[in-house]
Swiss-Prot record:
It is a peripheral membrane protein. GO terms for molecular function: metal ion binding. Its main location: plastid. One of its GO terms (cellular component) is chloroplast thylakoid membrane. Cu cation binds at H25. Keywords: Chloroplast, Copper, Electron transport, Membrane, Metal-binding, Plastid, Thylakoid, Transport. Belongs to the plastocyanin family. Its cofactor is Cu(2+). Residues 1-38 form the Plastocyanin-like domain. Participates in electron transfer between P700 and the cytochrome b6-f complex in photosystem I. This is Plastocyanin. It is found in: Plastid, Chloroplast thylakoid membrane.
């Protein structure tokens, strides 16, 4: 499982939704495109 950090507001103090700086997240499960290490 991947650890996801959820924060209230951005690092700059703005109250906005800012995903943690990471690679793109695929919500749809694609069994033909499983990333290595899974």
């Amino acid at each position: 499982a991947q650890t996801v950090e959820v924060k209230m507001g951005a690092d700059g103090g703005l109250l906005v939704f800012e995903p943690a700086k990471a690679g793109p997240h695929n919500v749809v499960f694609d069994e033909d495109n499983i990333p290595p290490g899974v």
